[in-house]
Amino acid sequence: MSVLEVKQLCVAYKRTPVLHGIDLPTISPGQVVALVGPNGAGKSTLLRTLAGLLPATGDIRLGSLDLLRCNRRERAAVLGFMPQTLPDGIALSVLETLLGALRGGDPLAAQGSARQKQQKASDVLEQLGILHLALRPLDGLSGGQRQMVSLAQAVIRQPRLLLLDEPTSALDLRYQNDVMSMVRQLADQGRIVVVVLHDLGLAARWADRILVLERGRLHAAGTPEQTLTPALLEQVYRVQARVERCSQGRVQIHVDGSVS
């Protein structure tokens, strides 16, 4: 079983430290882990570092694979990353974009005839409910549609580690829950999923574990019940709030006011 281990992770930007010796609890396959925290806490920086996109010191291991020091092909074979936004100026269709993502990863994942690869891409699009967009140019899509295509790119190679940066940010309420339900299914198939979320209600409903970041440090880690408390919300977000746990795992956070 390939667990994810992160020890003493440090990142600096122009010699200014932004992540300070982060040690994460061991994360096992089948778990959805949400990274939460206020703006500037280091959530996206941590996720991009896990994806191998930022230089860092420390240790990141997925099973026996050293993710900080392995080569790009080794990393691409096990890891899927969804950025906050896709770059503009991509003239390819959605289907062509997915086929490119398939070719860019594990050589074994890219094996098969052109028809088999197209079928694999179509299956992912259908699973996400966006098969009707297959032939549309990426630049002609709405923000929410582009978000769904970005998720499709991240999952098409069936990675063992899936890193998602705000996958629900441009989606309406229906699609937010659809996407998080899909994320849950991907984890249940034996993957590790680490997802940045601003919506604490979504984090509480869908995550097995929540990691709370503040100013580049790990402030708290545990289950939603252990972490999303009025005391923590006051300490980290500087708000006075009440946490109400409703039916079907839903959580409502009522903010009464800010703390000066």
Task: Tell me the role of every PLM-derived stretch.
Residues 1-6, 10-27, 69-71, 89:
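A short, flexible loop at the N-terminus of ABC-type nucleotide-binding domains that lies
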Residues 58-66:
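Conserved ABC transporter NBD signature motif
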